[in-house]
């Protein structure tokens, strides 16, 4: 990226913005390789696509890589959604059933995710407008169905008609077909630790869940 020499904004001292004339951004999809290059001092600046769970490793390598790590407040959240237009009509029916989505939300142990992935520094809420929340967002949606409750999640899944019909520990679709959720994600948007814990929570209520970066 090259700075626009005709950019109209200036700072309070009258200096034209932006301060940086040129930026060369390299795309590295693999998170481990991305962190390794940072630890080896192969970048001058990086903010995007860094997850809090990588901070300990980055801190350990700061002296070797001759860099500093600044942990600042951020507005980031992992969001999980279901394909409500799935070609499989039975899956589509289940994914469009609000009771199923409520169950999946209640099955997530957000307190554990906060402790393990965000070191207790996060705040659980639904995926609505971030703080400070605009006035048009009803506060009730912030905490809608976020309290960890496996019993209620199981009850809702029972009501949807999903049951373990063959004793393998996993629920089937109402018509008896097998169901397996496949979470496809990129570490540029969410840490693998968060995805792993969500997948485990869903498996615990009988919804077979796999994940792949």
Predicted regions and their residues:
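Extracytoplasmic/periplasmic ligand-capture domains
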Residues: 2-119, 123, 128, 133-213
């Amino acid at each position: 990226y090259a700075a626009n020499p005709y950019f109209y904004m200036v700072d309070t001292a009258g200096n034209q913005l932006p301060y940086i004339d040129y930026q060369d951004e390299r795309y590295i999809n693999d998170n481990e390789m991305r962190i390794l290059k940072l630890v080896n001092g192969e970048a001058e600046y990086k903010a995007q696509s860094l997850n809090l769970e990588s901070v300990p490793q980055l801190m350990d390598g700061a002296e070797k890589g001759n860099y500093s790590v600044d942990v600042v407040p951020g507005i980031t959240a992992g969001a999980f959604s279901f394909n409500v237009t799935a070609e499989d009509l039975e899956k589509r029916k289940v994914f469009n059933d609000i009771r199923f989505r409520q169950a999946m939300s209640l099955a997530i142990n957000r307190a554990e995710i906060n402790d393990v992935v965000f070191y207790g520094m996060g705040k659980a809420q639904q995926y609505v407008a971030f703080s400070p929340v605009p006035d048009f967002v009803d506060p009730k949606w912030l905490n809608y169905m976020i309290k960890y409750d496996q019993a209620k999640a199981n009850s809702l899944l029972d009501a949807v008609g999903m049951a373990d019909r063959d004793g393998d520990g996993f629920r089937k679709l109402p018509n008896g077909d097998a169901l397996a959720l496949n979470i496809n994600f990129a570490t540029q948007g969410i840490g693998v630790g968060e995805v792993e814990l969500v997948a485990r929570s869903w498996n615990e209520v009988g919804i077979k869940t796999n994940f792949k970066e």
